[in-house]
Amino acid sequence: MREFLLPYGKETLKAEIEEEHLAGVLVSELHDYKAPMGGAQLVQEALEHPIGTPRLCDMAIDKKKVVVISSDHTRPVPSRIIMPLILKEIRRGNPDADITILISTGLHRETTREELESKFGPEITEHETIIVHDCDDTDNMVYLGKLPSGGNMYINRLAVEADLLVAEGFIEPHFFAGFSGGRKSVLPGVASRETVMYNHNSAFIDDLHSDRKSVV
């Protein structure tokens, strides 16, 4: 009998398979990969040596309102590692920056206090300004025009009125949007329900080109 531990949420599930029913075990080459440095060092290195863009600290100079869009509780982004370094980099360039962390929930439910603490740690949760996006809060949306799909584009006022807008998260292939992260931090991340439904809907998912986009 072979025993396997399968990752499941924050825990693991145990599975047992009889040897006679086990054809083999496929092990990814990443299984034994060892990064040349730790996670915090990798992020710091990226912040100090960005590709094709000025350093974040330089972009933050003279920017009063800075908004950092962060993924919500549904995305396993290691924000405990990333966010402190992003905030430090912004304040390196502008110690007086008024920074708001905007949680990009899209149409998801509100991120709870406990989930924020789990994501960022108590230091950031206690001492930084964190706003959870609400797609139905129309009073805090700004109209920015028409989408190619014909829908109205409403985006969270904090993001629109920021002097500097930063998106924290990961980028991976997406089966109909091309790639997640980046632009998706804004739409659907901090857009209104009406706007999201014009851009993120069943018709797009069912489109014949949706799978093709995921490999572009």
Describe the residue ranges of each PLM region:
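Short glycine-rich or small-residue beta-strand-to-loop segments that form or flank ligand, phosphate
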Residues: 65-76, 100-106
